[in-house]
């Protein structure tokens, strides 16, 4: 099994961190946690409301608190928000307390998957493709830098991506335990 205390899913919005993460957590008998859901619970309001009335800095502060709390436990699969990796301390903490899986997706697939999403604050723009392209350019190198494993989820259903990730994780952990 995973030699790290937790399994951490990173990647852009629409990559499948939550939907695939729930399935992976169930398969490996891990407690599932979603940082965005935990932020909403802690703040008592929606992410859109936090962005609108308190701004992105306050949202990122809450995100950091929630992430630290979740990482202080073990045997969790933590699905992070797409921007969690922007904070250098978050990146350090995720690497220290988890096996980090980057669910990679291209901008066109993101657009398809998020076409009807009207709740994400960063997508409340006229040119969604440009917003996603800009986010991709900024965040992609950070995702890759801290990832222990990269899985591309383009053109994969959640079930297919889950099955592939289970195979990849199992093979990686078996290989790691054989070389330890």
Curated annotation (Swiss-Prot):
Residues holding substrate: 36, 60, 82, 139
Gene Ontology CC terms, in alphabetical order: cytosol
Metabolic or biological pathway: Metabolic intermediate biosynthesis; chorismate biosynthesis; chorismate from D-erythrose 4-phosphate and phosphoenolpyruvate: step 5/7
Superkingdom of origin organism: Bacteria
GO molecular function, one term: magnesium ion binding
Keyword Lipid metabolism tagged: no
E.C. numbers: 2.7.1.71
Its biological purpose: Catalyzes the specific phosphorylation of the 3-hydroxyl group of shikimic acid using ATP as a cosubstrate.
Name recorded for this polypeptide: Shikimate kinase
UniProt organism field: Xylella fastidiosa (strain Temecula1 / ATCC 700964)
Gene that produces this protein: aroK
């Amino acid at each position: 099994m995973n030699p790290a205390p937790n399994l951490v899913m990173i990647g852009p919005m629409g990559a499948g961190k939550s939907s695939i993460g729930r399935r992976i957590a169930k398969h490996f008998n891990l407690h599932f946690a979603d940082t965005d859901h935990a932020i909403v619970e802690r703040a008592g309001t929606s992410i859109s409301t936090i962005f609108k009335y308190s701004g992105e800095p306050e949202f990122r502060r809450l995100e950091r608190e929630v992430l630290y709390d979740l990482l202080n436990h073990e045997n969790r699969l933590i699905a992070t928000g797409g921007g969690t990796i922007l904070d250098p301390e978050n990146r350090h903490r995720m690497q220290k307390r988890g096996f980090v899986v980057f669910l990679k997706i291209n901008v066109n697939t993101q657009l398809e998957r998020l076409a009807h999403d009207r709740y994400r604050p960063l997508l409340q723009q006229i040119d969604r493709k440009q917003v996603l392209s800009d986010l991709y350019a900024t965040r992609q190198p950070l995702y890759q830098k801290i990832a222990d494993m990269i899985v591309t989820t383009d053109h994969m259903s959640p079930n297919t991506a889950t099955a592939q990730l289970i195979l990849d994780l199992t093979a990686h952990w078996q290989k790691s335990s054989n070389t330890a």
